[in-house]
Amino acid sequence: MGGVRAVAALAFAGVVGLTFLVLGCALPRYGTWTPMFVITFYVLSPVPLLIARRFQEDMTGTNACIELALFITTGIVISAFALPIVLAHAGTIANSACFLVNTGSVIMFGTIIAYFYLHRDDDSGSWSQSLF
């Protein structure tokens, strides 16, 4: 039953994160949907690590493939937080909309991290190899 609760908690956290994102766009006070582009970063953030885990070589010491994937993932995550800040600085969105979108990003990326943490021991071939 613990697995069902974990999946339900992850789903709820994802819904809360997306709710903050939609609130930052849809409230009449803000009136612009440009922060919705952050969803692109949510989708792209796990891709480099998934690819790196799939093609990981057995090497002693550090692994360049994993390090490159972590670097690219870090760039994607920072871009997800930077986009609303740049839009707010340019005057495209309000500062409060930027706060709502970045709050949603914190929750969504926390959900993505929790998903990979909870499913790290699944027996699915090389996809289940630990990254850290």
Swiss-Prot record:
One CC-aspect GO term: endosome membrane
| UniProt entry keywords in alphabetical sequence | Endosome, Membrane, Protein transport, Transmembrane, Transmembrane helix, Transport
What main location does UniProt list? membrane
Give the GO terms filed under biological process for this record.
Answer: late endosome to vacuole transport via multivesicular body sorting pathway; protein transport
Protein's UniProt keywords contain Transmembrane = yes
Is Hydrolase given among the entry's keywords? no
Q: Where are the transmembrane segments?
A: 7-27, 32-52, 68-88, 98-118
Q: Which InterPro entries match?
A: Vps55/LEPROT
Q: Where in the cell is it found?
A: Endosome membrane
Q: Which domain of life is it from?
A: Eukaryota
Classify the protein's membrane topology as the record does.
Multi-pass membrane protein
What is the documented function of this protein?
Involved in endosomal protein transport.
Entry's family note: Belongs to the OB-RGRP/VPS55 family.
Q: What is this protein called?
A: Vacuolar protein sorting-associated protein 55 homolog
What organism, scientifically named, is this protein from? Caenorhabditis elegans
